[in-house]
Amino acid sequence: DLHSFPTRRSSDLKPVTILTATSGDTGAAVAHAFYGLPNVKVVILYPRGKISPLQEKLFCTLGGNIETVAIDGDFDACQALVKQAFDDEELKATLGLNSANSINISRLLAQICYYFEAAAQLPQEARNQLVISVPSGNFGDLTAGLLAKSLGLPIKRFIAATNANDTVPRYLQGGEWAPKATQATLSNAMDVSQPNNWPRVEELFRRKIWRLSELGYAAVDDETTKAAMRELKAIGYISEPHAAIAWRAAALSATPRAPHWRTSP
């Protein structure tokens, strides 16, 4: 709604093209938010064969003002094409380019809200002990959480939980930024090896004089993800893979061990 509200105000606005890359979830959300709106064209890039059939159907079957393009590559390749388009000033002006990816700050502003909502659901005495484990791919969600903390939300600590695409955990562990080829995993919305929000994360830590070493992290493989999903089901919670990864990382944070982990089955 935050993205689409301005386009609902008038059918006389200049035409806008929403160019978005998706690793699975964003595509459907964007397509349904803008579907049928006047003067708005949506172009969604996604990695061919690397999202689930259900996710693909959710945004590839609408037609109308929603166009989809399957890219022979991974999400990082899709994201690179979006960045390339936004670097072309003539193209931006001609098409009225905008985006629903986190390259657009309004995406993060909306995500800030549910951190406050989550904290509000806790008893007052528990809020200063809040540790949030964030399933992370492109790291926009974690960036939003850090922005919430910078606005005064009393979050004690964050945990960045990734799948096998572990560029950030390896960087935090060894100090070397060394992206590898993106791996397809059960948690496909997190299949990102070059998260473009990571510079924002580092900048927030720098500006707020927070120590990056306080950021917890865990890289969780598919077998461990499956085990976490089974454990959650056994206690009455039906989870999808992304949340299961975050839960596993949070569970590890409660054990008396070092604050950073790499899990194995």
State the predicted function of each range.
Residues 3-10:
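Short, small-residue-biased leader/transition segments that mark boundaries at the very start
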Residues 13-16, 37-42, 63-66, 93-94, ...:
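Short coil/turn connectors at secondary-structure junctions
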Residues 13-30, 42-44, 128-138, 259-264:
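A short, small-residue-rich loop immediately preceding and capping a beta-strand
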Residues 17-53, 58-59, 65:
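Glycine-rich, mobile lid/loop segments that gate access to catalytic sites or pores
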Residues 19-32, 52-53, 136-145, 168, ...:
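Short glycine/serine/threonine-rich phosphate/pyrophosphate-binding segments
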Residues 55-103, 107, 159-245, 249:
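Active-site/ligand-binding loops adjacent to catalytic centers
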Residues 80, 84, 89, 93-148, ...:
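Domain-scale recognition of functional cores that engage charged ligands
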Residues 247-265:
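C-terminal non-catalytic interaction/assembly regions of soluble proteins
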